[in-house]
Amino acid sequence: MKKSNTTKALLIGLVLLSGIYSCKKNHPGPQQRFDIGQTNLVADTAGYGAAKIDPALKNAWGIAVNPNGVVWISANHSATSPVYDKTGATLRPPVTIPSVNAGDPGAPTGIVFNGSTDFGGNKFIFAGEDGVLTAWAGGNAAVKVADRSAAGAVYKGLAIATDGGASFLYAANFKGKKIAVFDSNFNLVTTKPFADTSIPADFGPFNIQNIAGMLYVTYAKLKGPENEDDEAGPGNGYVNVFRPDGTLVGRFASTGTLNSPWGITHAPAGFAAPFETILVGNFGDGRINVFSLQGIYIGQLQNNGQTIGIEGLWALDFLKSNATNTDPLFFTAGPHDESHGIFGSLKSTITTTGGSMGNSSGY
């Protein structure tokens, strides 16, 4: 990681921490309008206006990228990981994701890139709804590295972070209503609590994302009686911020416009607002909520005054993480009840209507 990026990440974390415990309000001034144009790069079938068709891209879910800009996607309903460049061009055959038994198809959701020699040197690691973690170091198939299927785990998201100089994986066990933590040898760790008793009992962690060294956890409502999928609806969502040791920093967002939130990312200044923001995507209604770094709600992404809604929206990722990133926002989606898949991008254009919008820390 470049020194400038590290410094920026630390500053973001400090801003977040200061905002959680302050009581100042947001003071809007003259504004600019940020119009967001959508481009569907790849879809699994015709009918979505995508330039490229890849039948493997069914229920496109998590996104991870290596330092060369190569994009890996979890295709949940084809049990594969298609690999593209930033234009959606296929770079290699999709990698097969196994389940509990090697010959059975997996159900990948979250995915992370591992740039270290930890985790057996595997470069891409996947979480699955079958309660299995799989990893890829080469070849045409990932391999199973952890199996919590017997305990009924349903992993919907995955993050990687360091704590005390050691690397860990963090999997959002939706059905189990907890964050499962694994060490660099894929052993389960039980000393990191990730607890918040103020979250209603019928909500579970839907996703987890590392932003500037903090772990953002989104929560969705469990759909009974199986409690394996979410129950979408206005206000059905929470977002918390935790340290990698599992201690709670604070509540970032609650109910309101949240609707089964899954995708979450840090946006550079000039994308959704003149200042840096946190974007939280709703799987429930496909809308993308915009917050200040301190959790102040700003609005939802729009284009020409119309709120953007991407059916089956999953991941949001700028692929590069810095304040001056010029990449568009990349997204994945599983439209038509997750039976199809889209990989696309969102690009911001600015219409000036005055100065910039002021922003101060606070909840």
Can you name each region flagged by the protein language model?
Residues 18-22:
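C-terminal motif of bacterial Sec signal peptides marking the signal peptidase cleavage site
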